[in-house]
Amino acid sequence: MTSLDYVHGYTEDEATRLADQAGTLADLLHHDTQYPEGSRVLEAGCGVGAQTRILARRSPSARFVSVDLSAQSLALAREAIEREGLSNVEFKLADLHALPFPESSLDHVFLCFVLEHLPRPEQALRALLRVLRPGGSLTVIEGDHGSAFFHPRSLRASRAIECLNQAQAAAGGDSLIGRRLYPLLQSLGLDDVRVSPRFVYADKSRPRWVDGFTRKTFIAMVEGAAEPALRLGLIDRTAWDAGIADLKRTAEDDGTFCYTFFKATARRP
């Protein structure tokens, strides 16, 4: 994946969205992610460090090496780690298909919201497994935009989401990859493959989720796909704006929103 392939873009708004998303989802996605003292953990595709901060705080005695293909994103990640006073993270500019680490040199591998942007996720996983020691753990977290359902129902809102899916597919990605994690990891011959769905539900009685997920994570993500969706001719501006307006209705007092993430773990034989 190159910077041009990231459908959400590398804007300041996207960096803010990623940070908001990570904070909102921290407990849901990471309550069972901890690494032992002294272990070396590779975070592949760390981006702006939104997940890095959570990992480093939750496993302060582990050593993280976080890699990304974007120097711009790595600079933001370093700033975020320094602001929080964390000292157990090292950043490297690297392509996860050609990692600068010896074979079997790392104890654990973690990646979150990365495979969805890659045209050949199996190939990327094989490259990651090369540097993972036998018996070491692999953790993969992905969403699945096909799992989004909401009230009030709206074909226009669903069309806007589908435009994001199509734009991501045009860039070589798969926004529905969450449902594929189990067969994907199984096909690589890994041991102890397990997938845990992580369900989000937001309504007026759960204002933190309405604001943090419905508005600042999901709707903001779809809004960020306007440029590629319009450029590719997937939709016109009037229909796009109507879809976004209907999506925003789901965050009002009578609205509801549901979504499922998938967290997969496995071990290298």
Explain the meaning of each model-derived region.
Residues 97-108:
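A short acidic, Gly/Pro-enriched loop at the edge of an enzyme's catalytic core
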Residues 107-121:
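A short SAM/SAH-binding and catalytic strip from SAM-dependent methyltransferases
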Residues 20-39, 54:
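Conserved alpha-helix/loop element of class I SAM-dependent methyltransferases that forms part
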Residues 42, 48-98:
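Class I SAM-dependent methyltransferase SAM/SAH-binding core
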Residues 139-208, 216:
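Conserved catalytic/acceptor-binding region of the Class I
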Residues 3-23:
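Class I SAM-dependent methyltransferase Rossmann-like catalytic core
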Residues 122-137:
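A short glycine-rich, Lys/Arg-flanked "PGG" loop and its adjoining helix->strand segment in the class I
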Residues 7, 194-257:
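C-terminal helical/coil "lid" or tail adjacent to the Rossmann-like core of SAM-dependent
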